[in-house]
Amino acid sequence: MNGVINIYKNTGMTSFDVVAIVRRVAKMKKVGHTGTLDPAASGVLPVCLGKATKIIDYIMENKKVYRVNLKLGMVTDTYDLEGEVLREEDASHITKDEILNCINSFLGTIDQVPPMYSALKQNGVRLYELARQGIEVHREARKITIYSIENIKIESNDNIQMDVCCSKGTYIRSLCYDIGEKLNVGATMTALERIQNGTFTKEEAINIEDLTEELLEKHIISIEKALDSFEKITVNEKFGKLLRNGVKVFDNRMYSEEVEFNKLYRVYEDNGVFLGLGKRDEKGFKLEKLLIEE
């Protein structure tokens, strides 16, 4: 069985718990998820089976959409409700306009400092392991992109909800923390749900607790379909043969579409055969990942 199953992970489970269940249902070992969701978070977690594990890194590059709830006036060491409360402040004087202006100031490409309670490593040690020992170290800010923040609901300063569309590597907990710091009252994330990962949506996801062999076979998505978020280009069979053999082709006659530099495309031969993912640079076009079904 080769393909991707769009799973909905419930709170209280690790992402590896989900993989273990899929392995058991599918009766196969070659299974992997496409980006960790914390146990306290729920939501969309595409899981790759068989040859589809080759495309895990590409699915992880997808834009993500998260539905997040945050509370103003409280800061914890983990930036969420799992941690120890470090300080509490009165946030009742903060107006809705101030909150909206602050939230919208984070749109675009920004520098974000990852939280201490994260799986990132420093000198070979995971940050959360240092944090549990009471050690805080300097973390370099990383470039991330917030594409949009929509459906903002301010029920009270204790409950703000919003949908955040962001790039790979974004820590929503850190976004909540940074919003609180900019408002000078602190903030903590109180709930997190991933509602979309590229073309994989919450509405089409199978709850992991409902997964059966029958549902898996019915809803598994082909490798080709799972890469729908990448634009498609078509080459003729002559050039397709060269690409299959790992040749970098420098010939603009190869494709009829406008092909940008350093951008991944789904590559098809003009007979409809899907070859894989390819990229153009100054020296030509080459398949980065051959995915043809032999």
UniProtKB/Swiss-Prot annotation:
Gene3D superfamilies the UniProt entry points to: Pseudouridine synthase
> What keywords does the record list, in alphabetical order?
Isomerase, tRNA processing
EC number of the protein:
5.4.99.25
| Reactions the enzyme catalyzes | uridine(55) in tRNA = pseudouridine(55) in tRNA
Q: Which InterPro entries match?
A: PsdUridine_synth_cat_dom_sf (IPR020103), PsdUridine_synth_N (IPR002501), tRNA_psdUridine_synth_TruB (IPR014780), TruB_C (IPR032819)
Can you tell me which residues form the catalytic site? D38 (nucleophile)
Which biological process terms from the Gene Ontology are attached to this UniProt entry? mRNA pseudouridine synthesis; tRNA pseudouridine synthesis
Pfam families given in the database record = TruB_C_2 (PF16198), TruB_N (PF01509)
| CDD domains, per database record | PseudoU_synth_EcTruB
Q: SUPFAM superfamilies from the entry? A: Pseudouridine synthase
Please give the Gene Ontology molecular function terms for this protein: RNA binding; tRNA pseudouridine(55) synthase activity
Query: Main role?
Result: Responsible for synthesis of pseudouridine from uracil-55 in the psi GC loop of transfer RNAs.
List the PANTHER family. Answer: PSEUDOURIDYLATE SYNTHASE TRUB1, TRNA-PSEUDOURIDINE SYNTHASE
Q: Which family does it belong to?
A: Belongs to the pseudouridine synthase TruB family. Type 1 subfamily.
Quote the protein name from its UniProt record.
tRNA pseudouridine synthase B
Q: Which organism is it from?
A: Clostridium perfringens (strain ATCC 13124 / DSM 756 / JCM 1290 / NCIMB 6125 / NCTC 8237 / Type A)
